[in-house]
Every structure is written in C-alpha cells, then in structure tokens.
Amino acid sequence: MGKRGKQRRKDRRGPNKSKAQLPYKSNSAKDFYKFQEQLKQSNLAMQEVKADGNCLFRAIADQLDGNQHNHDMYRQNIVEYIKQCEDDFAPFVEDDVDFETYVKNMKDDAEWGGQIELTACSRLYSVNIVIYHLDAPTYVIKNEAGKGSDTIKLSYHDGEHYNSVRNVCDIDSGEPVCKYKIINPLREKENGDTLRDDDGSGGEWQLSAAQIKLLLEKPS
C-alpha cells in the first residue's frame, strides 16, 4: 500500500492523530492469530479485505453491502460529504496540506483513509463504528443521530490496514452486516424514502455532489 507517498500521510486521524490515542500492534503472523483469538472470545472474526490502499473503504463496503465491490462508490460518497462539510473537517487536516488538496487526493484510488473518513462515514450513513485493536480497548465513533443506529465493526492492524469484522457464523456469507439509513434527496417522500431498504438490499447508489448538498440542507 505504499505508493504515491502514503507513508507520509498514513497516520491522518483527525482529532485522534497520536498513536497513543489510536493504538496498534505489530501485525506479525503470531499477532494476527492472537487478534483472531481475541475477537473469537466475542464470537467475532475478521473478514479480510485486500491491502491495496483501499482497505478502509473495502471494509466499509463489506459491512454495508456484504462484499468489497463498491468500495470506490463509498470512497467517493464519503469524500464528497467531507468536501461539503469543510468547516467541520478542515481543522483536522494535517498542516502540510490544504483542505482542497486533501479532498482531491482522497478521491484517488488507493489513497489511505483514516479518522476523518471514518467520522464522515458515521455521519453520512447514520451508523456507529467500532474499531477493534489487538490488546487494546475498542475505539468507538457514535453516530450523532442517537438511538437506532446500526454498527459497523472493523479491525485495525499495524497502523496501516483495516479489515471487516463479522460474527463468526457470517464469515464469507456475502450478506451485509450493517443496515444504514440515508435519505436520497431526489426520491425523498413524506414517509422518508431511503437509499437502502431495511432488508439490506441495495448498494447501487452513488450520490452526486448536489444530492449530498441537498442532504446537508434538509431539516432534521
């Protein structure tokens, strides 16, 4: 995953930039096995995703769609949301890059995502996010919408890789883990039409900049 200067940028974590605040351990084969055993105690297991710089978005896609195919769609939607919410996210972009450049870079395939993208994902898709670490407390991003939000579960490895986390019985099932609710401004009705039905089907929606702008302007 080390192309296009990502070594310099890989630790972007928004309000939690320091490694002490977002801990990780070396991802040797021994540690990977230990991590799996740690998750197994909670009836969980890792659904591994490809380590190609898109791992965060692949893991999100696995949670929401049941597979990794639409990872770029999730990347583009999340980054567009960040762009539309510049006042919220710009303060957490590293000082060596301006916000416009950050957004432009993050739209690129294989650009590493981190804390900013996780927070945007939680807000855009109305989900909580739990991130598991080896021998460390879980890291939780609670959705601001409050009650009723479903939860994305991820594992974080060696400070540079995310995997999807599923119940043991759901590994390789191809079924979505987490149901999200996001209003489609172009289809919205009084009863609240959504991009995804509660049966977990969907995944075909890519939001335009105009749609996300409408979403942000819609009264809650």
What are these regions (language model features)?
Residues 24-42, 47-143:
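Papain-like cysteine protease catalytic cores
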Residues 4-11, 104, 121, 159, ...:
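Non-transmembrane, interaction-prone segments in cytosolic or luminal domains
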Residues 1-48, 193-220:
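Non-catalytic, low-structured ubiquitin/UBL-interacting segments
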Residues 109, 114-219:
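Deubiquitinase catalytic domains
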Residues 11-16, 20, 31-38, 66, ...:
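Aromatic-enriched hydrophobic runs in primary sequence
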